[in-house]
């Protein structure tokens, strides 16, 4: 006997609409007899679907029949219309039956828009120095999107690139996308507080993200200038006195100038170095000039002058050698490695203890077989006040060598320089065979360059 089919809609189990994958919709008819059946498809407005239809062969199950029809539609044909469903028309036994098959909901997610700005030291190249603004739109769907840039509200026609839209997390539901656009800017425009806008257009909506430099011209009190006197180590090693002028809290190093001059106004050759950028976005810089030791020791005065566009007038800082303080030469003790350490056969530590000196400025170096060792080979502590002896200082320097070097009879020398020593320098030498330091008074490692006064 004839049995009419029961019909059911079929929808895709895949993630919601993307811009590439076809959308599968289907119609299932089952429990019918005899086996002759056909399907057609219409849009919601009754126009016929003529492409992408596939009807599968009829299957016999439990004495009756089952059949399915599938339609594959591109997202474009759905997204551009307002259809909420398709109509599956089942033709059986001279009768027709319509079944509404709902179109899968279109996932719509607005983009998250962020613009990343360059750090203060992020500009490079010849003037005008350049850097980049990076606009990132993430977590949006569907895929079609447009990114553009504005400068002070006017559309930027060139100088930017926009990467292809990419999938964020494959397999996620719904499928989301991201896109990155990069705009090249000049340091001058950035520091002049030009406002840059990343504009993102998606699904008829516009998303704007504005950025600009927040470093307005700083008041003059924000820029700080310090003078740093030459250290004894510099004087001892190079026979010249290096005057340092440290400038901090700079919003930019453009227009910065640091110059040194003598008390008579004679300019000194000044080397300027941009030191670093700080977490608060400011810069430090220093200007260094070398003068002869005699002028420094004779307490001649020198002046550092700093000019910058954020200063209403030049900053001037004066420096000269401080008045005499009580001088006392250091006592130097050289300690060989401890036997317990050597028994481990790993390393050997030679310690140079320097005590009872004043002023605190001192130089400590090491020699191996008479050759100067690089500073990376040893560690010297900063001078500390001597306990129970006000006005006096101590320090220690540790040289670590291999156990094999020590046992081979290598000689190690601690060289100490201090202005209260008769020849500015003294040294102690130790090796395995003696086990006791030997005292020498030398002036062998002072530089023969620089510092000559005329």
UniProtKB/Swiss-Prot annotation:
Outline the segment boundaries, as ranges, of region: CH1: 1-104
A GO biological process this protein is involved in? MAPK cascade
Q: Name one GO cellular component term.
A: perinuclear region of cytoplasm
Question: Which residues are tagged with the site Cleavage?
Answer: 96-97
Region feature CH4, mapped onto this chain: 324-435
Distribution of this protein across tissues and organs: Expressed in bone marrow.
Q: What is this protein called?
A: Immunoglobulin heavy constant mu
